[in-house]
Amino acid sequence: MAATLPVFAVVFFAMVLASSQANECVSKGFGCLPQSDCPQEARLSYGGCSTVCCDLSKLTGCKGKGGECNPLDRQCKELQAESASCGKGQKCCVWLH
């Protein structure tokens, strides 16, 4: 039991450090996206993403705003301003967790 205490302390410290850095990108008002979804000109150097920190205001279309196109009858939170980019019979949905 005594040997697990130092291991627990190291893990706890690492988690606190990671969580303090994890919010840097988001706390600045940006978002984490895969490299393939964030063009070079929208990428930022803030930390906290396992992917890349992206200036979401520079992105356009449903996917660029973090949504996905779904049929009109699908229940979701709709980004109405981006639904036109989905095409006829589709709407832009974001999933709230």
UniProtKB/Swiss-Prot annotation:
InterPro entries: Carboxypeptidase_inhibitor_I68 (IPR019509), Myo_ane_neurotoxin_sf (IPR023355). Keywords: Fibrinolytic toxin, Hemostasis impairing toxin, Metalloenzyme inhibitor, Metalloprotease inhibitor, Protease inhibitor, Secreted, Signal, Toxin. Pfam families: Inhibitor_I68. It comes from the Eukaryota. One of its GO terms (cellular component) is extracellular region. This is Carboxypeptidase inhibitor. It is found in: Secreted. One of its GO terms (molecular function) is enzyme inhibitor activity. Residues 1-22 form the signal peptide.
